[in-house]
């Protein structure tokens, strides 16, 4: 939503703005299935769609836009966001009319002007997209890039969460990150401008504000910002979340952060091996980082501390140091032990062959082996990290039972057809009443559902009133395993396993029957080994 707001403001402020009507973002954007979103798009009849692509939405976005173009042949498409880079593996087909690398605000008015004045014949012909680079445009001040403080688009979400950018640009030049490749200079809002935005968000119901600055304490007026936040949030009704550099943080600054009600601060450490840090351009003074994290803890700010694994030149000893580093804090911090991702446009991706990095071809581009660690070794590292720190969260504590917690919509049953399905949601539970005669339909229905909606989250629930052969359960697991992978599967599944996250199978036992505990345990183990 922040990207849409910035592009809206850029167009409204330009001479190109009067030529366009900006359609409101449909509420279905956050919760709709692909078909729901397609129906909304076709109903709105846009001339241009501008989409922000990230590693978690690019496959779905391209799939949806391809379908939209079949329904709206004259639709023009502009793609931007952190995923857009030259030689992107998913952007080889001529789907988009324009690709924007870097910040879209200085380029967007010119892009849509070009689309508007292009002759129809050239618009209708599918061709390679024109590439626009923000580095070739005059950079905007942040105050000129963001919507005005009182713009209606500046709203918290339904949960009271709002996002606010106060400083654009990062002092770090990390080889694994694409941020510094998109912008080299920095620009910021003045503290009083930020104060005005916080007050307005507060009046509009914000309870938590996440500052999206890549490094909040790199703001040139950092201490003045803290003093302002203390003043406008004296009653601490708003909680703030920030990302900072711990090695430059003083105790007094941490104290001021607490007074402003900054309750969480994310700190990236990544590695403590000097050789690794040199390759990824990540300078580190370990003692100063310790000092900064201790200051946060002393003032009751919970740090999220990030380390990475599968970095170039990283050996098992460095990984062990990283895990011990995180474990020593216990529950005082939120530890994150993250796989290295070869994001398009980053130095690490460009140097992958030279550095001996092998990664997934599709998002999230997770590194599968390095010059020093095999895939088997990385799988063992992931297992150790899960045992020490805990793995990815799962909303469903069990796969077999009379009560199954964490189901998306726990209602409705079907014998293999589409009853019991909430069609408009991007996360859906489909129930099947088991019987031997309808069992063949169940696998076919699962395949058909995922073929129709490959990007939403699916839970398939088999309701039973007797023990069923485990061969039947295994056959449905095979059906799901043969489906095209989802980006969440590629992110979460351990490297030495093929666990599925986006489509999962559950067994719900009728409340009136009692089944053999041994059968239940064996079935639970079977599903637990197949699904997250």
Which residues does each PLM region occupy?
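N-terminal [4Fe-4S]-dependent radical SAM core
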Residues: 116-163, 409-425
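Glycine-rich beta-alpha loop elements in corrinoid/cobalamin-binding modules
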Residues: 7-10, 19-141, 494-495, 501-532
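Structural motif
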Residues: 52-54, 244-246, 429-440, 461-468, ...
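Conserved C-terminal portion of the radical SAM core fold
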Residues: 48-50, 76-78, 195-198, 202-212, ...
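Radical SAM [4Fe-4S] cluster-binding motif and immediate context
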Residues: 147-303, 309-311
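Active-site beta-loop-alpha junctions enriched in small/polar residues
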Residues: 54, 82, 165, 214-216, ...
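Generic structural signal for well-ordered alpha-helices
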Residues: 5-8, 62-66, 112, 162, ...
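C-terminal accessory regions of radical SAM enzymes
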Residues: 330-333, 344-465, 469-472
């Amino acid at each position: 939503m922040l990207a849409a707001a910035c592009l809206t403001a850029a167009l409204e402020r330009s001479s190109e703005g009067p030529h366009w009507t900006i359609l409101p973002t449909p509420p279905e954007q956050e919760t709709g299935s692909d078909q729901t979103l397609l129906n909304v798009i076709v109903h709105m009849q846009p001339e241009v769609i501008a989409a922000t692509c990230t590693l978690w939405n690019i496959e779905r976005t391209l799939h949806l836009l391809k379908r939209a173009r079949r329904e709206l042949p004259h639709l023009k498409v502009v793609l931007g966001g952190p995923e857009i880079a030259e030689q992107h593996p998913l952007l080889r087909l001529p789907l988009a009319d324009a690709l924007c690398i870097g910040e879209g605000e200085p380029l967007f008015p010119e892009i849509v002007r070009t689309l508007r004045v292009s002759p129809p014949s050239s618009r209708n012909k599918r061709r390679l997209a024109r590439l626009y680079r923000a580095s070739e445009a005059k950079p905007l001040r942040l105050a000129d890039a963001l919507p005005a403080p009182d713009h209606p688009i500046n709203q918290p979400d339904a949960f009271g969460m709002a996002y606010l950018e106060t400083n654009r640009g990062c002092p770090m030049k990390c080889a694994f990150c694409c941020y510094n490749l998109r912008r080299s200079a920095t620009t910021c809002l003045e503290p009083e401008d930020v104060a005005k935005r916080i007050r307005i968000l507060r009046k509009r119901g914000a309870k938590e504000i996440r500052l999206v600055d890549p490094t909040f304490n790199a703001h040139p007026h950092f201490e003045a910002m803290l003093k302002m936040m203390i003043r406008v949030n004296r009653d601490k009704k708003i909680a703030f979340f920030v990302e900072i550099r711990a090695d430059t943080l003083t105790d007094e600054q941490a104290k001021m952060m607490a007074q402003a009600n900054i309750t969480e601060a994310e700190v990236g450490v990544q590695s403590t091996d000097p050789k690794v840090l040199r390759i990824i351009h990540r300078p580190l003074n370990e003692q100063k980082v310790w000092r900064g994290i201790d200051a946060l803890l002393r003032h009751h700010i919970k740090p999220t501390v990030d380390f990475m694994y599968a970095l170039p030149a990283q050996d098992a000893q460095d990984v062990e140091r990283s895990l011990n580093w995180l474990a020593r804090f216990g529950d005082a911090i939120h530890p994150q032990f993250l796989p290295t991702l070869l994001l398009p446009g980053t130095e690490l991706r460009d140097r992958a062959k030279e550095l001996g990095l092998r990664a997934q071809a599709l998002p999230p581009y997770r590194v599968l082996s390095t010059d020093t660690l095999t895939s088997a070794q990385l799988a063992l590292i992931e297992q150790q990290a899960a045992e020490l720190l805990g793995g990815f969260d799962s909303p469903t504590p069990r796969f077999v039972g009379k009560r199954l917690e964490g189901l998306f919509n726990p209602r409705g049953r079907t014998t293999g057809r589409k009853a019991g399905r909430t069609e408009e949601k991007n996360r859906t539970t489909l129930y099947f009443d088991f019987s031997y005669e309808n069992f063949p339909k169940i696998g076919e229905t699962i395949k058909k559902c995922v073929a129709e909606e490959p990007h939403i989250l699916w839970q398939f629930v088999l309701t039973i009133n007797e023990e069923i052969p485990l061969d039947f359960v295994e056959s449905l697991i095979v059906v799901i395993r043969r489906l095209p992978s989802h980006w969440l599967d590629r992110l979460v599944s351990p490297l030495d396993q093929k666990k599925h996250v986006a489509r999962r199978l559950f067994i719900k036992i009728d409340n009136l029957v009692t089944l053999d505990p041994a059968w239940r345990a064996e079935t639970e183990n079977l599903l637990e080994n197949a699904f997250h």
